[in-house]
Structure formats: structure tokens, C-alpha cells
Design a protein with these regions (language model features):
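Negatively charged
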Residues: 1-255
Length: 255
């Protein structure tokens, strides 16, 4: 059962739907999303906290570009959902989702990307099956949750995950990124110097603009194995604080 795009760009709709039985719905993609290109202002901000979404497998773009929706979803059972791409992207959603069961999640890219309001505790999220967190918090300028305990062992793409996330300063030293292949733009425009010296970057191929416009970053990453990297373009562009010896890096595969 699908509700894909049901109220997409329905800018005037703001009626109560709290009593709906959505227990058989599997797809809620773009259900209440706005339109970035026309600057349409969505008005939907109703209480749907009691919805039974336990059958939903994808929430992709459900509230993206909806600047007003900010209702409590803390009790939602999202344990069967695998796709959360852009769910709250470019919105102002800022509610507690710390208890969400993300054990089935695989794709979280851009989930809060462009959301300048979101700043909730996500430290206990189980992302052990997630493969993609690209742009997850890009331009989420107030987000500062502790993510040090996240199990990232299955993640392959972290490109832009914290791009211009100005408030973010979590310890990421224990992240397992051994399966990651792309980390372009990862810390671009950030204001902290993460201790990532021990990261296993041996499978990385793309480091484009990774530290671009970082004014603080100056960690010793001299021991990084970058032998598989093919793209380092603009990697340290305008990284005004960086001054470490990386003379021993093997850049023979960079093209």
C-alpha cells in the first residue's frame, strides 16, 4: 500500500489526519514534501504522532522542504524501514527521535541535510546496517549530538556527512570506516579538528574537498594509507589551520 506523494506540494493542506489507519502502508515517500524550486510554502503541521507506521519501509523525502512541520514523532515504530533519504532535509523539524529503532535502516543520506533547526540526541541510534550517510547532516548548522558510539562498520559512503555543520564537534576517533570508499567534502566548512589520525582510510578512493574551508583542522594524519585514492582535488583548499607533514603519503594513484 502506497501513499507516495499524496500531499506533495499541496501547499494549502493542513487538516487533521491523526485518526487515519496507516498500518498497512509500506511507502510514504514524498508524502508531505514541498518544492524547493518554486519556493512554495507548505502549511501541514498536524499531529500524526499516533500513526502506526510499523509496516513502512521507506520514508524518503517525506517532509523535505516542508518548513513548518514539527510534530512529535517520538513514538513512531520505524523498525521495518530501511530508507530515510532526505526525510527531514531542508526543513525545520526538531523533535526527539532518540528512541527510534533504526536497526533495519540502510540509507540515511541527507536525512537532516539542510535542516538548520535539528539538534537532538542521536547517540543511541543503531546504524549497524547502514551503508550510506552521505550529506546526512550537511548544512545542519545547529546539530551537535555525540555520535562517538555509532557503529559505522558497514558504511561505504560518508561524503559530505558533516559539510558545513558549523556546531558539530563530536569525537569520531573510534569510527570504523574500513569499508568506506568515498569521503569527499566530509568536513568541508566545519569548525572543529576531529581526532581521526587512526582512521583506516585504505579503501578510500575519493577525498575531494574533504577539508575545504576548515579553519581549525590540524590533526596529524601522516600515517594515513592513501594509496588507493584517485581524487584529492581541492582537498585542503582554504584549510587555513592545517600544517602537518604528509610527505610520506603514497599518492601514486591520484589522477
Amino acid at each position: 500500500v502506497s501513499m507516495v506523494g499524496m500531499f506533495s506540494e499541496a501547499t494549502s493542506f493542513n487538516q487533521p489526519l491523526g485518526n487515519w489507519d496507516v498500518s498497512n502502508v509500506t511507502d510514504m515517500r514524498s508524502m508531505f514534501n514541498g518544492n524547493n524550486w518554486t519556493d512554495d510554502d507548505m502549511t501541514f503541521n498536524q499531529d500524526i504522532s499516533s500513526w502506526n507506521v510499523s509496516s513502512v519501509t521507506t520514508f524518503q523525502y517525506m517532509f523535505v522542504h516542508n518548513p513548518v512541520f514539527n510534530s512529535d514523532l517520538s513514538s513512531w515504530d520505524v523498525s521495518n524501514a530501511s530508507i530515510f533519504i532526505g526525510m527531514f532535509g531542508a526543513s525545520n523539524f526538531n523533535q526527539d527521535v532518540s528512541s527510534w529503532d533504526l536497526s533495519s535502516a540502510t540509507q540515511l543520506q541527507s536525512m537532516f541535510g539542510g535542516n538548520a533547526s535539528f539538534n537532538q540526541d542521536l547517540s543511541d541510534w543503531d546504524i549497524s546496517n547502514v551503508t550510506n550517510i552521505a550529506d546526512m547532516f550537511a548544512y545542519a548548522t545547529t546539530f551537535e549530538s555525540d555520535l562517538s558510539g555509532w557503529n559505522t562498520s558497514n558504511v561505504t559512503n560518508i561524503s559530505g556527512a558533516f559539510k558545513y555543520a558549523a556546531a558539530f564537534e563530536s569525537d569520531l576517533s573510534n569510527w570504523d570506516i574500513s569499508n568506506v570508499t568515498s569521503m569527499s567534502y566530509l568536513f568541508a566548512g566545519t569548525n572543529f579538528s576531529p581526532n581521526i589520525a587512526s582512521w583506516d582510510v585504505s579503501n578510500i578512493t575519493d577525498m575531494e574537498r574533504m577539508f575545504r574551508n576548515t579553519t581549525v583542522f590540524n590533526e596529524d594524519i601522516s600515517d594515513w594509507n592513501v594509496s588507493n585514492v584517485t581524487n584529492m582535488s581541492l582537498m585542503f583548499m582554504n584549510a587555513t589551520g592545517f600544517n602537518q607533514d604528509i610527505s610520506d603519503w603514497d599518492v601514486s594513484n591520484v589522477t
